[in-house]
Amino acid sequence: MSGPVSLSTRSGTEPAYLIINADDYGYFNGVSHGILECVQQGSVTATGVFANSPFLDEHVSWLAAHPGVDIGVHLNLTDRLPLTQRLSDALNNWDGRFPGKFSIAKAVLSRRIPVDLIRDEWRAQIEHCLARPLKLSFLNSHEHIHMLPPLYPIALALAREYGIEHVRYATPEWPRAWSTSAMLRDGIMSVLSLINRFHMPHSAPIFLGMGESGRLSQQYMSNLLPKLRPGRVYELMCHPGIADIEEVKDSRLLAYHDWERERQTLSDPTLKMALATNNVRLIGYRHLQTTREGLRVRTEEIST
């Protein structure tokens, strides 16, 4: 792997542009507080909101103090309760709750759950956020469920309907992880992204962080930043938070997410130095313009 690149090596060139996007805002109190700490530090520039969070109104009120962070909807089909009664009724095998990602994927692909119900649910989730009110810049989804081929066009259509310019195009990082489960995930995501590429209306930021999901570290950032190419736009997915075992009772979530390490990685003062050294400029979705040729960065709107 290449080492750090000095300023003298890359000075005078256009910077690489990086959106650091925190998933799961509204998931738990500790998660939202951890995300906002990173926003305050200036490292997180966007966050996706759980529209079906039972804490939504309270957590949305905290965002008022942070107008510089871009907000999107973290579309959900895999955790907690749906907002629409019709989808809840269709999930009777799971007591009206969202099942895990594999169960919902199987139900969608087998047409046991009609995609019209998914469209209505996601529309409700978007409108739930707009009613708060939140200005929405992007859509993504919990556990990348919107990348399922029957669902990706729905996410794109809803984005057009509501004037939301950006939809995450999630892709794996090869080669990143060598565990059996990670290789299976990355293989599946490679196939899904290839299928969905035919539906993409324009370029999307280059996606980063799948291989480090739940485990973003300083070492990863040190290896990543020198590799970002001048003039390209990237989105780094992250999951910072404050772990609270009194609040989070699911041992699987605690095992998967190292919220504290991600928060510490993104709050570390050396991150800003590394960004500057490698000529990487943090931006938000608000700084992007979609054109026929792809993404254009509104550099004149980026504060220095």
Predicted regions: what they are:
Residues 1-20, 29-70, 74-138, 149-304:
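Terminal accessory/targeting
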Residues 24:
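His/Cys-centered metal/cofactor-coordination and adjacent catalytic loops
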Residues 141-143:
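Active-site histidine-anchored catalytic micro-motif
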